[in-house]
Amino acid sequence: MKAILRASRIGRVILRYRLDALLEGTPAERWLRLAKPFVPRASAEIAAQSRGARLRLALQELGPIFVKFGQILSTRRDLIPADVAEELTLLQDRVKPFDGQAARLIVEAALGLPVSVAFASFDTVPLASASIAQVHAATLPPDANGVRREVVVKVLRPEIERQIDADIALLHSLATLVERTHPRADKIRPREVVAEIEGTLAAELDLQREGANASVLRRFWEGSDDLYVPEVIWSHTAERALTLERVYGIPSDDIAKLDAAGIDRKALAAKGVRVFYTQVFRDNFFHADAHAGNIWVDSDPERRLNPRFIALDFGIMGQLSQEDQYYLAENFMAIFHKDYRRMAELHVEAGWMPSNVRIDELEAAARSVCEPYFNRPLSEISLAQVLIKLFRVAQRYELTLQPQLILLQKTLLNIEGVGRQLDPRLDIWAVARPVLERILRERYSPRRVLRELSKRLPEIMTHAPDMPRLVYSWLTQQVEGRHQIAIRSPELLALDLSLRKLQTRVVTAITGSGLLVVAAVLYGLHPDGWYLGTVPVWSWISGGAGSAALLVAWLRR
């Protein structure tokens, strides 16, 4: 019943913000059309706004979980129009804080200790509050030297898992409905989007996992002058409570404060770009939620001329496969050299495009995207925008991208935005190119090859004795003509599934029609038995069942 009420509320919000066009061609649109006369419409001021703005306002009204849904959806620029994605990036994950005493109880349950024992002090007034968790200031008990260390404690909201499970279940139902009925479902891939959102939210609900992310990132950047990562206090961390060293800094978008502190913004902007490319191509572990609120600048006066970033919030991290890492770096270098042929070849070699695509057509498409950028000033060129437009154009040729690559696009866009805000004349290409060239040199260096070989040596030694037997067996099969090839085609499986669904619909429709005929025959025969009005009860039952079957067949179109 709760799910029905929740779905009803979502429908009312969709109608009020005039978003029913988003569901065009689906059964949901037909039901909404019936409800439209009974739902008050939005004001003329809201109606005049763009579809992206209306969607953003609707998500904000539906609550924090849908705000998070919108934020994640904004990263899927391969699935939604650019104007909608841009508007969804404005969603703010700020909600009313929950009671500080409730936070104390959650921390005590998570750590298995009273707060008064675990901490010397715990401020019940939160420093910040979001849809998943909120953050409290605290101090640890005195150490051996009598020092009370300042920390922050991130605490999950009470019953947040139950709320998310209910909303995700509803989103899964809506996604299944859209996939079955929407004419562009193969392009939107709604179930894939909801599954990605579910995975992202599940990761953010495990604060111990977030602590592990922070710990790994800190290890990569230990002692760096470019990036600082707060230390995780593992003795005070659990699944529902995360304790980190407290850090002080200036948000990277607060230009007035940065200037007042005498920070060298030009040096800082270049460092931001280098840090990102190093995370992606050296460490293969990048901060994937790098907006200005999560990227601070160290406020230490001694670091004015050699500024350092501080990373916060480690719930969403990204990693690429070795192949994607290499092909992405090669793609960037091909862009630098205006080698459109190589860009087209790399898209196919990486497996992002089907092997039967015409390289010359893809080359022409890449040229049409990149050439307009090369005629702009260097300070206006965006690698993120080039990459996004390349992938969008490539969708015409059945582009297949892993979610991590899409996450990287969004992160690169954020990093470039932060860099350009700090230094509007930042030449991102000049900063990124040396990093990429070094990465590619190292990839082919003899030292790296030997290192990779030494890692695989135990595996090679394990399988080496079996190789002669396997080769002999394969050659014997070739000579005797016994070699068989097993073909597994996702397209054939999808076709089989579509045919099964069609068969089910046809059978349901035939059954429904038959029951209606039975109802009419019974009515004409006037059989003995019970009547409801002038119609036999069995006619009512048969007619009702037939109508229900036809309705089900219609909804499954």
Swiss-Prot record:
Membrane topology listed for this record: Multi-pass membrane protein
Which family is this sequence assigned to?
Belongs to the ABC1 family. UbiB subfamily.
* HAMAP family, per the entry: UbiB
User: What this chain does, per the record?
Assistant: Is probably a protein kinase regulator of UbiI activity which is involved in aerobic coenzyme Q (ubiquinone) biosynthesis.
Its name, as the record gives it, is Probable protein kinase UbiB
Q: What is its main location?
A: membrane
**Cell compartment(s), UniProt:** Cell inner membrane
Q: Where does ATP bind?
A: L127, A128, S129, A130, S131, I132, A133, Q134, V135, K154
Domain spans labelled Protein kinase? 121-509
* Catalytic residues of the enzyme: D289 (proton acceptor)
Which residue windows are transmembrane per the record? 506-526, 535-555
One GO MF term on file is: ATP binding
Q: What EC number(s) does the entry state?
A: 2.7.-.-
Task: Enumerate the UniProt keywords alphabetically.
Answer: ATP-binding, Cell inner membrane, Cell membrane, Kinase, Membrane, Nucleotide-binding, Transferase, Transmembrane, Transmembrane helix, Ubiquinone biosynthesis
Task: Specify the pathway.
Answer: Cofactor biosynthesis; ubiquinone biosynthesis [regulation]
A cellular component term from Gene Ontology for this protein is:
plasma membrane
* Family annotation (PANTHER family): CHAPERONE-ACTIVITY OF BC1 COMPLEX CABC1 -RELATED, PROTEIN ACTIVITY OF BC1 COMPLEX KINASE 7, CHLOROPLASTIC
Origin species, per record, is Xanthomonas axonopodis pv. citri (strain 306)
Alphabetically, which GO biological process terms does the record hold?
Answer: regulation of ubiquinone biosynthetic process; ubiquinone biosynthetic process
